[in-house]
From Swiss-Prot:
Signal peptide: none annotated. It holds the Pfam family Ribosomal_S14. It comes from Burkholderia vietnamiensis (strain G4 / LMG 22486). GO terms for cellular component: cytoplasm; small ribosomal subunit. Binds 16S rRNA, required for the assembly of 30S particles and may also be responsible for determining the conformation of the 16S rRNA at the A site. It comes from the Bacteria. Keywords: Ribonucleoprotein, Ribosomal protein, RNA-binding, rRNA-binding. PANTHER family: 30S RIBOSOMAL PROTEIN S14, SMALL RIBOSOMAL SUBUNIT PROTEIN US14M. The keyword Ion transport does not apply. Belongs to the universal ribosomal protein uS14 family. SUPFAM superfamilies: Glucocorticoid receptor-like (DNA-binding domain) (SSF57716). One of its GO terms (biological process) is translation. InterPro entries: Ribosomal_uS14, Ribosomal_uS14_bac/plastid. This is Small ribosomal subunit protein uS14.
Length: 101
């Protein structure tokens, strides 16, 4: 199981991304808008750089909801592969069965 501090750090990043999402999108739109003056675009770029680093969605890491494992996490379930296997064998995920051919 991942350390609790790492899990909490990811939760904090998710909160920051949600908090600054609208502002970040507005600033990026200004930066990419060719009809704006160079000065306006430059100011928007500087303001974008002043936002917290962790408010950037690329810094987020998908983690297992149960264990906090950062790798092997399935987006559809939000769980790590080994937890999906355990839960699926118990029959707790509807429609998910072990493959046989």
């Amino acid at each position: 199981m991942a350390k609790l501090a790492l899990i909490e750090r990811e939760k904090k990043r998710a909160r920051l991304v949600a908090k600054f999402a609208a502002k970040r999108e507005a600033l990026k739109a200004i930066v990419e808008d060719q009809s704006k003056s160079e000065e306006e675009r430059y100011e928007a770029r500087l303001e974008l750089q002043q936002l917290p680093r962790n408010s950037n969605p690329t810094r987020q890491r998908n983690r297992c909801a149960i264990t906090g494992r950062p790798r092997g996490t399935f987006r559809k379930f939000g769980l790590a592969r080994n937890k999906i296997r355990e839960i699926a064998f118990r029959g707790e995920i509807p429609g998910l069965t072990k493959a046989s051919w």
